[in-house]
Curated annotation (Swiss-Prot):
This is Testis-expressed protein 44. InterPro entries: DUF4678. It comes from the Eukaryota. Testis. Detected in germ cells at all stages of the seminiferous epithelium, strong expression in elongating spermatids (at protein level). The gene is TEX44. It comes from Homo sapiens. The modification Phosphoserine is found at residue 333. Residues 1-32, 46-100, 133-215, 235-258 are annotated as: Disordered. The keyword Ribosomal protein does not apply. It is found in: Cytoplasm. Keywords: Cytoplasm, Phosphoprotein. Residues 87-98 have a biased composition (Low complexity). Residues 192-207 have a biased composition (Basic and acidic residues).
């Protein structure tokens, strides 16, 4: 794009003269080009004007870049040709300071990026923009770095104000409650306390309602007083000079009642109980006393002892032992009967043994005698016929 009043060839020649050898022509300092375009004086010595404008514009470019960006290289005063100026774009790898800021406050990170983007607008090609636009763009970075740090502080102040507002509101509620400006809950509590004070629940007609604002010690004292009134109401003091009578059945403590004997009797009759009662008392009925239970326990161990206690007219155990009875005997009588039985058994056993031996001997004797007789008969019967045959004149 050629500017009016300037030939395209002159601009290219000036760029080739200003740029150092070995560098591409697209990396010529843009601030010098902007000032060269803004100068409306046509002269033939283009190089001298370009160098003078670059020297005057170098401090302005350094001030617009700010103290944070150190990437721009300031040309030395001894050199005529400027060094390479890199564009002020945000780096792809953020520094540790930027990472920590982004972790702590994302809003501050975005504002820093916006400020860097606005500062990088200066490096756009100057030959495509007019004089007024470039001057406006150059003036914007001068105000942006100043306003950028103030934005996080304002945001932090607003955040602190929002965080402090609930605390202040709670403190206001507490202060209002202390000054008497209660909330709806305090009003409802006061209203319910007033209703309870209007409709008390007393244990007896003479009791009075306790105020709601009394301490626990005062409430305990009132309860003790009310109990004393109760005791006076139920048990009036006796007249002077008279002995206080014992309390009747109706003048008993609350929660107690006299014993009922019907609770300790059998609720239903049992066949076993009826049979045992009929054996002992000669009649049918249920349990009536503890003696029946004791008698039953003895009858279960031995019916004879229980019958002896009930049927005999003796009053002591010694009488029962010395009395004549089939089952009740003294210890000596029992020992004598045992000894007599033993002796009688021994004697009878011995006599029976002797009788048995005698019987055995008798049988042996009888058999022996019979054997001798049979032998004599045999001899006599055999010897006599032979002698008769030997002596025929024996007759």
């Amino acid at each position: 794009m050629a500017l009016p009043g300037y030939p395209l060839g002159n601009v290219d020649d000036s760029r080739s003269k200003d740029s150092p050898a070995g560098e591409p022509q697209g990396q010529v300092p843009l601030t010098a080009d902007v000032l060269a375009v803004s100068s409306s004086v046509a002269s033939t010595d283009w190089q001298d004007i370009d160098q003078a404008s670059f020297k005057t514009a170098t401090p302005r470019a350094i001030s617009t870049s700010g103290d944070k960006d150190k990437s721009a290289v300031v040309p030395e005063h001894g050199q005529k040709t400027p060094r390479k100026i890199t564009p002020l774009l945000p780096s792809q790898n953020p520094s540790p300071l930027q990472v920590s800021m982004s972790l702590q406050n994302p809003a501050w990170d975005r504002q820093v990026q916006d400020a860097r983007t606005s500062q990088s607008l200066v490096v756009f090609p100057s030959h495509l923009l007019g004089k007024d636009k470039m001057s406006q763009m150059a003036s914007v970075p001068e105000r942006e770095p100043e306003s950028a740090p103030s934005a996080p502080s304002a945001e932090l102040q607003s955040t602190q104000h929002m965080e402090a507002q609930p605390v202040e509101s709670d403190a206001d509620h507490v202060t209002a409650g202390a000054n008497g400006q209660h909330g709806p809950q305090a009003a409802s509590t006061t209203k319910s306390a007033e209703e309870k004070a209007e409709h008390p629940k007393a244990p007896h007609p003479e009791a009075e309602a306790l105020p709601s604002d009394e301490s626990p010690v005062a409430m305990g004292a009132n309860v003790v007083d009310s109990l004393g009134d109760l005791q006076t109401w139920f048990f009036p003091p006796p007249p002077a000079g008279s002995v206080s009578p014992s309390p009747g059945p109706h003048e008993v403590a609350l929660g107690r009642r006299p014993l009922d004997s019907s609770l300790y009797t059998a609720s239903e009759e049992n066949s076993y109980m009826r049979s045992m009662t009929s054996l002992l008392d000669r009649g049918e009925g249920s349990i009536s006393s503890l003696a029946d239970i004791l008698v039953w326990s003895e009858t279960t161990m031995g019916m004879a002892i229980a019958t002896g206690f009930l049927d005999s007219g003796h009053s002591t155990v010694a009488d029962l032992l010395h009395s004549s009875g089939p089952s009740l005997r003294s210890v000596p009588s029992l020992v004598g009967s045992v000894s007599s039985a033993f002796s009688s058994g021994l004697v009878s056993g011995t006599s029976s043994a002797l009788r048995t031996i005698t019987r055995v001997l008798e049988t042996v004797e009888q058999r022996t005698v019979e054997g001798i007789r049979s032998a004599m008969r045999y001899l006599t019967s055999h010897l006599t016929p032979r002698q008769a045959q030997a002596d025929p004149n024996y007759d």
